[in-house]
Amino acid sequence: MLARLVAWNTYLLEVEKMARKKTRASAPVVQEARRAPDFPPALTDLDASGLSACARCFWAKTGDGARAWLSVVQHLMDAADVAGYLFDEYLSEHHRRLMASVWDGDQAKARAVFIFLAGVHDAGKVSPQFACQSVELAEVIRDQGLAVMRKMDYAERAFLPHGLVSQFALQDAVAAGGGDARRAHQWAILVGIHHGRYPDSEAVRVAHLQYKYQEGSVADDPRWGQARSEILEWMARRSGFPLIAPGTALPELPIAVASAYASALVIADWLASNEDYFPLRPRPDKADGKRTIRGYPELSADQQRERAERGWKRAAFPSPLRIPEVPAGEGGEFYRHRFGWPTSYRPTEAQRNAVEIATREDPDLMIVEAPPGSGKTELAFAAAEVLMR
């Protein structure tokens, strides 16, 4: 997994290139002021049963000789749900605050965005270039009237990886919903890099041309794009992300914040892709001689919650250190709480001063000199906790 977290350079160059283009503009461009989008409530009980058969027919994972699978929508639900657990129970407070910094510190919005990104990262697997890799499961897609040729017939499929299809689909969806296209591009790159690698600008240009004009494009068969859009809109409702928000703009995405989202997204995908945590399901059966999604039993909302909870428990991720805040002027209560002192105990002057200075100044290093009996042991532990926060 660590290898997937280190390839940020091309992504950073892409963002910096966009900034340079903006700076080199020969004349100032007056743009209509756009407000930040409002977040709708998340419909967390939304399962896949309400999606069209076409949106449900695409495969994301397969195994056991293609006798088992996960559909795209099932894998995306798994990734979205485990992202919620990651945000709530694994990411540090600093990590969450960094993600929320572009949302005026609102961690609920940061959480919704993270869950949405995890829930659409593999929407690009709704493409013939990916679908052709399983002969058996391509039958399920063909049953919906879509053309999937043999893998060898897609000579240029390597130029359009599914991560970039996810990226292009997301930025198109935000723009189509009335959002600012440039900001949409910044955020959509996060799903494009979910394998930890991002191609150079020329490779992205070639991929975008294929996305627009080759097999599975709007020019070829718009139903592929319609299925992706349906999945994106469904996940936006499920996670509470403002995908359709006319006249708005997502916030600027600083590199540090982008790295915070992208690194967490890699972990969410890694967990959701582990078959020990999120087992494959039986593949669709044949009906009238054809393998079809028709009649396939999707998991209910309750079953999906149980699946996500079971997967998270199996992963057994450690909980981060959670250090309580120190209320101003309450050094005594802090020490009593941290060390189990009775109410009659009072911290020494050195102990009170150390916590107050650490809270106020946030130094990188503290050196405390005090006479014996000043409580330097508890002082050191208390000050260290404040600095770690």
Segments from the language model and where they lie:
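Accessory nucleic-acid engagement/destabilization modules that flank
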Residues: 6-327
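Short acidic-aromatic active-site loops that bind/stabilize oxyanions
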Residues: 68-76, 155-156, 340-351, 373
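Well-ordered alpha-helical segments embedded in enzymatic catalytic cores
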Residues: 78, 82, 349-354, 379-383
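Conserved coupling segment at the C-terminus of the helicase ATP-binding
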Residues: 320, 324-328, 333-335, 367-371
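Conserved pre-motif I regulatory segment
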Residues: 332-367
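Walker A/P-loop
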Residues: 362-383
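Conserved SF1/SF2 helicase motif Ia
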Residues: 386-389
